[in-house]
């Protein structure tokens, strides 16, 4: 996991796994604990798509950085480019150049990049720009959940590594009703100007890791262990 201080083994080759799409169901079934934003369970339609077998690595993202990804406005959403320019950003949070080589600040202090480790601490804008550079896109939350509910042997790092940005705006599911009182304050009033993240990170506490869990952050958030899983359209 990205919280580990021991360098991981070489990353497995990135492969693509296809899903037929069609009319599917997502959301919590109502059995066991879930937050109100995880339901109601409902049907949605998916076009055929492919999901990457693993998360994007530090080495892969470094190629984006070195290839001028932060200087190419064609790769960025308009608001993302304005934010990047205003902040003067040219690399991910916690990355530093030391004697010509990229390092990143970790829980064990400043360390050289571990190329096979998933890249984290990325905003939605950075994740989206990288996906465009890679000839791909970010998955929707329905695509992510549908894939994760299948036989996931070929699709790894779904949980416990990094929260994965989706291109889905954080909004209520069909039939959602804000609960009365203080309980309704938590999710209902935050359903605007944020994006959904799926999975969980190495820093996720117990009880916040399940197939239907919907995390959410504004597009500029970088402080969490947030990473990238790529998706592509088929047909």
Q: Which positions does each model-derived feature cover?
A:
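An exposed tryptophan-centered "aromatic clamp" motif
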Residues: 150-168, 179-193
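Core domains of carbohydrate- and sulfate-ester-processing enzymes
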Residues: 12-22, 77-109, 183, 187-200
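Short, well-ordered surface patches within globular domains
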Residues: 2-4, 58, 73-101, 113-158, ...
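Disulfide-stabilized, aromatic/cysteine-rich ligand-recognition loop
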Residues: 38-49, 54-66, 70, 97-128, ...
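Short hydrophobic-aromatic micro-motifs
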Residues: 24, 51-52, 163-165, 197
């Amino acid at each position: 996991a990205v919280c580990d201080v021991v360098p991981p083994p070489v990353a497995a080759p990135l492969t693509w796994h296809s899903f037929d799409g069609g009319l599917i169901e997502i959301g919590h079934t109502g059995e066991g604990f879930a937050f109100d934003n995880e339901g109601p369970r409902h049907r949605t339609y998916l076009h055929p798509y492919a999901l990457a077998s693993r998360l994007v690595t530090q080495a892969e993202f470094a190629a984006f950085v070195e290839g001028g990804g932060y200087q190419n406005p064609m790769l960025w959403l308009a608001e993302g480019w304005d934010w990047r320019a205003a902040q003067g950003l040219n690399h991910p949070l916690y990355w530093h150049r030391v004697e010509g080589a990229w390092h990143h600040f970790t829980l064990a202090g400043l360390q050289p990049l571990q190329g096979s480790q998933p890249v984290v601490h990325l905003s939605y804008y950075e994740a989206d720009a990288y996906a465009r550079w890679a000839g791909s896109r970010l998955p929707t939350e329905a695509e992510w959940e549908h894939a994760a509910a299948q036989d996931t042997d070929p699709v790894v790092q779904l949980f416990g590594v990094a929260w994965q940005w989706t291109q889905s705006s954080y909004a209520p599911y069909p039939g959602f009703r804000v609960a009365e009182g203080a309980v309704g304050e938590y999710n209902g009033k935050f359903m605007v100007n944020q994006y959904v993240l799926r999975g969980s990170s190495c820093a996720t506490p117990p009880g916040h890791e399940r197939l239907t869990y919907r995390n959410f952050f504004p597009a500029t958030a970088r402080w969490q262990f947030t990473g990238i899983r790529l998706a592509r359209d088929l047909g």
